[in-house]
Amino acid sequence: MGFGKEFVWGAATSAYQIEGAALEGGKGKHIWDVYTENPGRVFDNHTGKVACDHYHRFREDVKLMKSIGLKAYRFSIDWSRVIPEGFGKVNEEGIVFYNQLIDTLLENEIEPYITLYHWELPYEIYKRGGWMNPQIVEWFGAYAKLVAERFSDRVTNYFTLNEPQCFVGLGFLTGEHAPGLKVPLQDTFEMAHNAMKAHGRAVQMLRQYGKQPLCVGYAPTCSMCYPETEKTEDIEAARQMLFSMQEDDQNWTWNVAWWSDPVLLGHYPEEGLKRYEKYLPKITEEDMKLIAEPIDVYGQNIYNGRCIRMGKDGKPEEVKRYEGFPRTAIGWPVTPECLYWGPKFLYERYGKPVYITENGISCHDVVSLDGKVHDPNRIDFLARYLHELKRAADEIDLRGYFQWSLMDNFEWSKGYSERFGLIYVDYQTQERIVKDSGYWYRDMIQNNGENL
């Protein structure tokens, strides 16, 4: 069977990573604008002030999307571009930009998918406590209301939060990302709970103010788990490990269940409640009802996974990777199996249609003497991973796949040192070059994965 006729093939980006124009068009500052002003925070002190200059070049970029056959494009709205302080006055210039982008996409028969939050927390909200401030639930709700009012006449697909594991864990536990803090564990659980409530309020606002029926989802991340063999006990071990909370305290955010059980099952996992009881904020029935506001689809960002088997003691154990295990340029393991087992386990537990909202590879791409960008490693990666996804499509309700990323961009703490794109960006000239993988992806889309 493979992928259905309605399967959505797309690519994804986020606002700060590509837009540039950080100080233009009435935009307010967000935490990444401020964070990157401090030397030593990002590789080689890179910033996103210009990035891919997509703010000025979006029409060219949409033409490139069409040239590689994209059916859909997932992008984030910069909260601080449309509401500079995060609350209060609306910036109409920002609204105009996103309206123009949406219209250009639709003119080129590319379906827009909007992510409300991909880490651009308005700095004025951060100064008021950010995710620690319970008011953020209503501020985020008002922002979602604005998005619904201005864009939902044309855009029907939305994801609320992108990778809350990252913006809480990397931003406030390890300090690797903006705002670069290392706060007490207790504070991170409060932030996480507020973020989950903000998600629920956003779902409510999108439903209430949408100008047509909307498809609303959520896009967390996590390393998936896959079994060493297809023996029943290894499969069960991988499933148990995926939904357990095995991480040490400083990495507690890197799990699936804490972030997805409340949204889709209506409660936090019992294991986590017991383990972290002393760190938890007050959690009410009203909170849980809000967090569990019904969504339509489940998005998951998947890049790699851990191989698991059932140990001799009857407990799941991770299988150590062999020396020389294949890795991407950024150092992430290459584990195609995760794109079969991950969606399968998620669908079995949560029962919602699944989108792969991000998946891709960083490679050391260069422009060759012939003026082209030959990236056979990316083509090989995509072929291996999508072959596994095709297996999953035979067994579960799988709706779409968004390759990360449309184009090379500002890769957070790595700056411009990592290239994930199907399209090469020369940051000195802003020239774009479609990589070999972009053409491979186009051909794969045309035959709907029949060649995998």
Each language-model region and where it sits:
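Active-site region of glycoside hydrolase catalytic domains
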Residues: M1-V42, E85-F87, I95-L452
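A common structural microfeature
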Residues: E6-V8, Y55, A72
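Aromatic- and Gly/Pro-rich amphipathic surface segment
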Residues: K29-K63
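N-terminal, well-ordered alpha-helical segments
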Residues: H56, K63-K66, V96-N99, D103
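Catalytic domains of carbohydrate-active enzymes, especially glycoside hydrolases
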Residues: R57-D78, E293, V297
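Glycine-rich, proline-tolerant flexible connector loops at the mouths of alpha/beta enzymes
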Residues: I77-V90
